């Protein structure tokens, strides 16, 4: 009783010694706030005590404080002064502590290289740790320490761990090799290449994923390394990581263009000879056709279809790129890629940045073949949740998909957006899309011109940039049929004085009036008279167009002059206005305006009126909407894509003479066989050949079962059934002094030696077999 009371008193004494700090740490498991206050109490004096403590919990608290100071940029504690106390914990048994020390080393190793080198031995010893996470962390820490003299040590460690039994460590080997290649460059190619070949032949998909990243970043041109892995990679494509799937697709596109035969297109409506798949996506001349693909190319395309339902949007975009570059429009449409891409545009689980990339991909495909997405044009109507960039790309897609059958719905949608949208950039793109719709037919052209003119003339406050874009659209549409739109030109001329227009809006109107000199010359002189007094206050582009307008008026006036006397510029009212504009332009600040004034003065002073007529009054071709007539599908600059997307969709040419290559699968390296462990998997996974019936050794041991089992170490053990085990119960009760005989059969020599000893023992003694090690072996007297 006294002893029990003493134990209780000792427990209370230990509980009283529990400090407030330890209690705060314990309560931190319930929330972050309590630990935050406790962490604040760790100052520069108490931190070394925690870092040098023999208790892992206190060391972890100290390292958490260090991480907090590093992350917040707090300079209240000079962490560099505690370098030795922190780094010595690199050999801690706690993996979390090791990770935090590694992060600290990454930050401060360069400031204390000598002290950092003292931890290398501990890190190298961790490469032999039984925990694969610890081994991978040690390898990562070695590569993160940015000290040039460590390169030989890191390379030696990589050569050792590239055949590690854990796939986690081998993945880290690939990442470390990539890091070394970025630092050292092509100089270490000979050292990295053998390890890369080993990683590419790995049986684990996770290791292959890391190896493909290394291959793409460091050896993208060494495609011949993939010959023996091509077919295996196609079969395990869906097992790779999502990032590696996109990488492998890009690599195999280049591989197929270089080493695989180009698909053949055969016209099924005639007996014409088959042709090679054209370089451009939509240049197949046959209305009905079939495509013959090489076996290996078809294997790759078939494996891609499994990824169309991937949760990663970039994987689906990569799949669409592969079909776009390697197949025909018919195969592209039949593969289901269109539905997968459309699903991404409306998914609520995808961020706006990814949707922008998906829409740019669709824009490229629509420019190549609008029929792919034309039936889904309503999926590109603007939504209230769309960002500005998403809306702009949708409008560009609509401008390509517009046709006579869907023009009514698209125009109505654009008018609605123009009346509700506030963003100037979106409204400018709406105007550009309307200009494409107006080119469908003269009916739509008249309706859109009337609507745009009403929008500009209304008192509704509109951004000047939007007004300028609408005027430019009007100019391009009026130029197509100037006689029909004289009234519209008169209204535009009045806007020069009634509206506060941007230079980008004024200059097109003045240019359009100059083109109308031959159609209706009575409008232009009065406009020029009102523009000349404001010449010096206008923008350079506007001043240049005023000078051109004066020259066009004078040239037309000279051509239409029918008097008997020679035309006199000085006595003509139009000639006088031209002289005034010429005089103002000669002293202009802009070189372009002065140069144009000198050229025009030279022409008219030397009376070269024919040249003036050809130069100023020649009919100009009216502009066309480039997106609606995207004949060259590879001219991506006209689509205003992001620079990275332009590079991503750069077309790779087919190799005209692909080299014959052996794509027979090479030997796969399975490192899981190196794992030495005795478990249920090692037992039940054994080949049936290992379970054999052994012959009876002697009559004295006839009761011992003859079944044997061979362990993963090569040792043999006898097995016993449940009935045989319980059959010896009565014998053991009748002979209480009998000793247990445990027999181990590791080799044939040990078996013979055991038989000799068993023959000299008593035959009445019972035996019992079980799984034992050599340290438990006993013999009978």
Curated annotation (Swiss-Prot):
It comes from the Eukaryota. Residues 699-712 have a biased composition (Polar residues). Residues 759-774 have a biased composition (Low complexity). One of its GO terms (cellular component) is clathrin-coated vesicle membrane. Residues 694-713, 731-781 are annotated as: Disordered. GO terms for biological process: Golgi to vacuole transport; protein targeting to vacuole. Keywords: Cytoplasmic vesicle, Golgi apparatus, Membrane, Protein transport, Repeat, Transport. It is found in: Golgi apparatus; Cytoplasmic vesicle, Clathrin-coated vesicle membrane. Residues 746-758 have a biased composition (Acidic residues). HEAT repeats lie at residues 113-151, 153-186, 187-224, 294-332, 521-559. InterPro entries: AP_beta, ARM-like, ARM-type_fold, Clathrin/coatomer_adapt-like_N. The keyword Cell division does not apply. It is a peripheral membrane protein. Part of the AP-3 complex, an adaptor-related complex which is not clathrin-associated. The complex is associated with the Golgi region as well as more peripheral structures. It facilitates the budding of vesicles from the Golgi membrane and may be directly involved in trafficking to the vacuole. Adaptor protein complex 3 (AP-3) is a heterotetramer composed of 2 large adaptins (APL5 and APL6), a medium adaptin (APM3) and a small adaptin (APS3). Belongs to the adaptor complexes large subunit family. This is AP-3 complex subunit beta. It comes from Eremothecium gossypii (strain ATCC 10895 / CBS 109.51 / FGSC 9923 / NRRL Y-1056) (Yeast). The gene is APL6.
């Amino acid at each position: 009783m006294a002893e029990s009371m003493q134990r209780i008193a000792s427990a209370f004494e230990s509980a009283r010694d529990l400090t407030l700090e330890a209690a705060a740490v314990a309560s931190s498991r319930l929330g972050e706030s309590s630990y935050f206050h406790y962490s604040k109490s760790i100052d520069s004096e108490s931190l070394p005590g925690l870092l040098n403590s023999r208790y892992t919990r206190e060391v972890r608290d100290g390292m958490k404080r260090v991480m907090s100071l590093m992350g917040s940029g707090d300079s209240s504690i000079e962490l560099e002064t505690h370098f030795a106390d922190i780094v010595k914990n690199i050999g801690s048994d706690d993996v979390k502590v090791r990770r935090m020390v590694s992060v600290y080393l990454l930050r401060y190793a360069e400031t204390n290289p000598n002290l950092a080198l003292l931890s290398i031995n501990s890190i190298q010893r961790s490469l032999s740790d039984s925990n694969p996470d610890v081994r991978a962390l040690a390898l990562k820490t070695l590569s993160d320490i940015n000290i040039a003299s460590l390169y030989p040590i890191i390379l030696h460690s990589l050569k050792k761990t590239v055949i590690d039994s854990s796939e986690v460590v081998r993945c880290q080997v690939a990442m470390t090799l990539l890091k070394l290649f970025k630092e050292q460059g092509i100089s270490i190619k000979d050292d990295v290449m053998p390890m890369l070949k080993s990683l590419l032949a790995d049986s684990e998909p996770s290791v292959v994923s890391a190896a493909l990243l290394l291959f793409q970043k460091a050896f993208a041109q060494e495609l011949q390394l993939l010959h023996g892995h091509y077919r295996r990679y196609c079969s395990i494509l869906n097992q790779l990581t999502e990032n590696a799937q996109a990488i492998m697709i890009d690599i195999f596109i280049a591989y197929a263009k270089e080493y695989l035969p180009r698909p053949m297109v055969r016209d099924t409506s005639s007996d014409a000879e088959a042709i090679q798949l054209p370089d451009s996506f939509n240049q197949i001349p046959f209305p009905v056709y079939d495509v013959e693909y090489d076996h290996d190319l078809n294997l790759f395309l078939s494996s891609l279809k499994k990824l169309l339902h991937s949760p990663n949007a970039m994987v689906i975009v990569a799949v669409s790129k592969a079909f776009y570059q390697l197949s025909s429009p018919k195969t592209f449409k039949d593969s289901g890629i269109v539905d997968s891409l459309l699903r991404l545009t409306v998914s609520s689980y995808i961020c706006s940045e990814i949707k922008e990339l998906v829409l740019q991909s669709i824009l490229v495909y629509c420019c190549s073949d609008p029929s792919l997405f034309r039936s889904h044009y309503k999926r590109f109507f603007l939504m209230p949740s769309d960002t500005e960039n998403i809306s702009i790309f949708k409008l560009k897609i609509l401008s390509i998909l517009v046709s006579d059958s869907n023009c009514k719905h698209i125009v109505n949608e654009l008018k609605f957006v123009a009346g509700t949208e506030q963003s100037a950039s979106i409204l400018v793109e709406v105007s550009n899309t309307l200009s494409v719709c107006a080119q469908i037919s003269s009916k739509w052209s008249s309706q859109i011109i009337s609507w745009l003119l009403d929008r500009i003339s209304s008192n509704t406050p509109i951004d000047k940039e939007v007004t300028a874009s609408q005027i430019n659209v009007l100019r391009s549409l009026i130029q197509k049929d100037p006689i029909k739109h004289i009234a519209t030109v008169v209204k535009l001329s009045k806007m020069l004085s009634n509206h506060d227009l941007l230079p980008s809006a004024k200059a097109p109107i003045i240019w359009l009036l100059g083109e109308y000199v031959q159609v209706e010359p009575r409008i232009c002189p009065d406009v020029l008279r009102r523009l000349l007094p404001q010449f010096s206050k206008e923008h350079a582009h506007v001043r240049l167009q005023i000078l051109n307008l004066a020259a066009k008026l004078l040239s037309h006036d000279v051509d239409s002059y029918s008097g008997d006397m020679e035309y006199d510029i000085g006595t003509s009212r139009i000639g006088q206005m031209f002289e005034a504009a010429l005089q103002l332009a000669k002293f202009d600040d802009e070189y372009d305006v002065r140069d144009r004034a000198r050229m025009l003065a030279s022409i008219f002073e030397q009376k070269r009126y024919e040249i003036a007529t050809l130069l100023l009054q020649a009919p100009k071709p009216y502009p066309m909407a480039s997106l609606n007539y995207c004949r060259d599908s590879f001219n991506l600059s006209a689509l205003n894509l992001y620079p990275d997307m332009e590079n991503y969709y750069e077309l790779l040419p087919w190799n005209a003479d692909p080299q014959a290559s052996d794509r027979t699968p090479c030997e796969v390296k399975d490192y899981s066989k190196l794992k030495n462990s005795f478990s249920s998997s090692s037992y039940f996974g054994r080949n049936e050949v290992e379970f054999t019936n052994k012959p009876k050794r002697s009559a004295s041991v006839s009761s011992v079962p003859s079944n044997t089992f061979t362990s993963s170490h090569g040792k043999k053990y006898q097995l016993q059934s449940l009935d045989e085990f319980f059959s010896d119960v009565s014998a053991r009760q009748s002979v209480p002094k009998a000793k247990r005989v445990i027999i181990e059969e590791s080799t044939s020599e040990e078996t013979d030696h055991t038989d000799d000893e068993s023959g000299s023992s008593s035959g009445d003694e019972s035996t019992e077999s079980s799984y034992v090690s050599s340290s438990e072996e006993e013999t009978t007297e």
